[in-house]
């Protein structure tokens, strides 16, 4: 990973009404210089896990320069896949989890792995709905994104 003096803290969350169903993600970007940005988007049909990953991808993609990133998420799936090397292993095995089961969401994991080559990312789990101000904000952004007539199409939904 590239070394960088830029320090960024990200909070991300995904939400889905039904699963699958309409979904959204929310992200809060806190830059080391004190700036703050919020991102969100809603999709017509997706899953909660896809929204969790897409929220992180959107936030990481938004960063203009290679950065040292601390990414907080309430998705153990994402934290474990990245921190324990599962996503890299799935990719090395042709997107297979094991001999019988394909890895889910390979399109998103591929993008996440590429972004983690650009940025130094540490994934940190945070308990959902436990009073963490920024995680709660991301949840509100994600829910609002799917409740407000989402019109985006998750191109990878149902393809893998």
From Swiss-Prot:
Q: Which GO terms describe its molecular function?
A: magnesium ion binding; nucleic acid binding; RNA-DNA hybrid ribonuclease activity
List the catalytic activities from the record.
Endonucleolytic cleavage to 5'-phosphomonoester
Q: Which compartments is it annotated to reside in? A: Cytoplasm
Q: Which keywords does the record carry? A: Cytoplasm, Endonuclease, Hydrolase, Magnesium, Metal-binding, Nuclease
Q: How is the cofactor bound?
A: Binds 1 Mg(2+) ion per subunit. May bind a second metal ion at a regulatory site, or after substrate binding.
Named cofactor requirement(s): Mg(2+)
Residues involved in Mg(2+) 2 binding: 13, 139
Assembly and oligomerization: Monomer.
> Which PROSITE patterns does UniProt cross-reference here?
RNASE_H_1
Similarity-based family = Belongs to the RNase H family.
Checking Gene3D superfamilies in the record gives: Ribonuclease H-like superfamily/Ribonuclease H
Annotated protein name in UniProt: Ribonuclease HI
Alphabetized PANTHER family for the sequence = RIBONUCLEASE H1
The gene coding this protein: rnhA
Q: Which organism is it from?
A: Synechocystis sp. (strain ATCC 27184 / PCC 6803 / Kazusa)
Biological function: Endonuclease that specifically degrades the RNA of RNA-DNA hybrids.
List residues binding Mg(2+) 1. 13, 52, 74
GO cellular component term, pick one: cytoplasm
In this protein, which residues make up the domain named RNase H type-1? 4-147
- Could you provide one GO biological process annotation from this protein's UniProt record? DNA replication, removal of RNA primer
One Pfam family in the UniProt entry: RNase_H
């Amino acid at each position: 990973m590239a070394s960088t003096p830029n320090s960024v803290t990200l909070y991300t969350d995904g939400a889905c009404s039904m699963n699958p169903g309409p979904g959204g993600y929310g992200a809060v970007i806190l830059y080391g210089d004190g700036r703050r940005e919020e991102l969100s988007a809603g999709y017509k049909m997706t899953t909660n896990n896809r929204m969790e990953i897409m929220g992180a991808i959107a936030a990481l993609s938004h960063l203009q320069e290679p950065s040292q990133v601390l990414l907080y998420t309430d998705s153990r799936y994402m934290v474990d896949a990245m921190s324990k090397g599962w996503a890299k292993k799935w990719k090395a095995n042709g997107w297979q989890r094991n001999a019988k089961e394909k890895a889910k969401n390979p399109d998103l994991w591929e993008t996440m792995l590429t972004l983690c080559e650009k940025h130094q990312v540490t994934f940190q789990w945070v308990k959902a709905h436990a009073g963490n101000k920024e995680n709660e904000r991301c949840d509100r952004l994600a829910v609002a994104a799917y409740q407000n007539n989402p019109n985006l199409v998750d191109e990878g939904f149902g393809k893998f």
